[in-house]
Amino acid sequence: VAMEYSPMGNIPYISRVDAGTIEIVRECGVEIVSSGDLVNSFEARWTEEQRRDNFEVAKIMRGAVDSAFAFVKENVLSHNRITEYDVQQYMVQVMKRAGINAGGPNVSVDANTANPHYGPRKEGSAEVKEGSFVLIDFVARADKPNAVYSDFTWVGYVGASVPEKYVKTWNIVKGARDAAVEFMRTSFAEGKTIHGYEVDDVARKYITDRGYGDYFLHRTGHNIGREGHGNGVHMDDFESHDDRRLLPASGFTVEPGLYFETFGVRTEVN
């Protein structure tokens, strides 16, 4: 019997049946196996309509991010004081005008970019000014019941020349991202089965080989569905060991990052 159970709790997202129920079923002489791949198959595959809507929203999101960076540039050059929260709310309005409810993007600068779960508040947000390193993590979906999310992260620098520490870190993070994506493309082309943890291993090895493994503080990616973090396979051999298979027509992020005391760099693609 396949149940929402994961041996040794390897994948806690799908391990939802309590231990007592497992014991009762086993006492009936029934073998229990994980329903992980079934959940992945039924919940993670996108329809063609979902894929089209996702791509359209992604284009709108890219336009909103470009507009946000232009908003920052205009205000900084005009010596107008703006904060992370101001940029966030500007983006929310841009998306509303496009008919998309995007919630509140994570707009962070400098030391706040080192917190992967940061979210600006109206009171106490940091100022965005010349010399700021900016990170924008942005989630949105079409206004339809079955629409799936798009989820991206961009980084930028407010100034004419980007300091070397940001360039160096960006190149490492980008290299890890591209290595993970290329691993998947090559494996699919060769007809190989890919498991979520393998994608994480590729990105993590790339970063570790360059001496920064201790600063990569989260999994490489997560499933995307009607929830921002869906129930399908995650690119994870760090927070959990996700041994589920990547399936055609499913969506997920690839988002390695490096986080230091004074700044963090993450790139996120779908």
Predicted stretch roles:
Residues 1-270:
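Active-site neighborhoods and metal-handling regions in enzymes and metal-associated proteins
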